[in-house]
UniProtKB/Swiss-Prot annotation:
Chain residues carrying a lipid of type S-diacylglycerol cysteine: C17
PROSITE patterns, per database record: PROKAR_LIPOPROTEIN (PS51257), TRANSGLYCOSYLASE (PS00922)
Entry annotated with the keyword Signal: yes
HAMAP family: MltC
Protein name, entry field: Membrane-bound lytic murein transglycosylase C
GO molecular function, one term: hydrolase activity, acting on glycosyl bonds
Alphabetical list of PANTHER family matching this protein: MEMBRANE-BOUND LYTIC MUREIN TRANSGLYCOSYLASE C, SOLUBLE LYTIC MUREIN TRANSGLYCOSYLASE-RELATED
Protein task: Murein-degrading enzyme. May play a role in recycling of muropeptides during cell elongation and/or cell division.
Membrane topology listed for this record: Lipid-anchor
Biological classification of the source: Bacteria, Pseudomonadati, Pseudomonadota, Gammaproteobacteria, Enterobacterales
N-palmitoyl cysteine lipid modification positions: C17
């Protein structure tokens, strides 16, 4: 719950640009759930980061980007899970090497619990974990994986001696160090969640390869994934749409909480349950399983209604039209005629990723 308390306090927190004091403050989750409120807060967050870091230097957490600010927003760690890079930067005028060293160590040794780290404040709440999330995804200059603090500290010292860079953006001098993840970092992260994926697959009758493909496309297996649409976690579940539908189908009232969806097992379960709903309820009128899979994939991104409207404004007629088409033609139609460019690309990405998981 700590994360969402800070989210509700972003505006005053950033105006003062100081560490937050959360004691004695009440958290109104219902207010934070409001999408407009979330958008306003994110806009304020971005504006204040720009004031501190300078124009074109705004960097925020996203589906495939972990971004954590510390030191009164003067130091940040960025993991780009798509590119496979860790970039640690600071604009601190005093002891920039020390700030970078601490950020490198904490980033390399952080755990995998998104509820334990506040991405929306400068609170240094990153706990050193006995099972670091990045263990096996990054190696030091000797080729060894990094689990212990002494090894992370030694590697940080090496990086400061050999890879420290600086640039002047006209407002600040930015000191940075970039670390590459191992080439198969994506597979390393996917492996962490295979047990959860298999359990959800058996529970809901959804192919493991499809679940993994959705996770790769949505978050690149980043458990800290957030988005401008307030989608959360590995499968980027939105509380008030997919989350609400799944809870209702399971006889639960209300919406899944943010902390619930940031738990990897819950997120995978909810996302997979929604895939099953799309397949067995919303798009059940599509007979061919391959055509229905294409529709389900596209609907996971843009909704079942938008998929059917590509073919007809009448849902029954849309299903009949799809049933009269070959699967390849359905794929071609969805990737060329869907009104959302994102949804058109989404089907291509997920379908391509699913093929790779079927071969493994």
């Amino acid at each position: 719950m700590k994360k969402y308390l800070a989210l509700a306090l972003i505006a005053p927190l950033l105006v003062s640009c100081s560490s937050s004091n959360k004691k004695g403050t009440e958290y109104n989750e219902a207010w934070v759930k409001d999408t407009n409120g979330f958008d306003i807060l994110m806009g304020q967050f971005a504006h204040n980061i720009e004031n501190i870091w300078g124009y074109n230097e705004v960097l925020l957490a996203g589906p495939k980007d972990y971004v954590k600010y510390t030191d009164q927003y003067q130091t940040r760690s960025h993991i780009n899970f798509d590119a496979g890079t860790i970039t640690v930067e600071t604009i601190a005028g005093t002891d920039p090497r020390g700030r970078l060293r601490q950020a490198i160590i904490k980033t390399l040794l952080m755990g995998d619990d998104p509820n334990s780290i506040d991405l929306y404040s400068d609170v240094d709440d990153i706990q050193i974990s006995k099972e670091p999330f990045l263990y096996g995804q990054v190696v030091d200059n000797t080729g060894a994986s990094i689990r212990w603090e002494w090894r992370a500290a030694r590697y940080a010292d090496y990086l400061l001696q050999t890879r420290l860079k600086s640039r002047n953006n006209g407002l600040r001098v930015i000191y940075s160090i970039t670390i590459n993840l191992v080439p198969n970092h994506l597979d390393k992260r996917a492996h962490k969640y295979l047990g959860m994926v298999r359990q959800a697959s058996r529970k809901y009758g959804v192919d493991e390869s499809l679940i993994l493909a959705i996770m790769q496309t949505e978050s690149s297996f980043n458990p800290y994934a957030v988005s401008h649409a307030d989608a959360m976690g590995l499968m980027q579940v939105v509380q008030h749409s997919a989350g609400k539908d799944v809870f209702r189908s399971q006889g639960k009232s209300g919406l899944p909480s943010r902390s619930y969806l940031f738990d990897p097992a819950n997120n995978i379960d909810t996302g997979t349950a929604y895939l099953a709903m799309l397949n067995n309820v919303y798009l059940a009128g599509i007979d061919n399983p391959t055509s229905r899979r294409y529709a389900v994939i596209t609907a996971y991104n843009g909704g079942a209604g938008s998929v059917l409207r590509v073919f007809s404004s009448d849902k029954v007629q849309a299903a009949n039209i799809i049933n009269s088409m070959a699967p390849g033609d359905v794929y071609q139609t969805l990737t060329t005629r869907h009104p959302s460019a994102e949804s058109r690309r989404y089907l291509y990405k997920v379908n391509t990723a699913q093929k790779s998981y079927r071969r493994k």
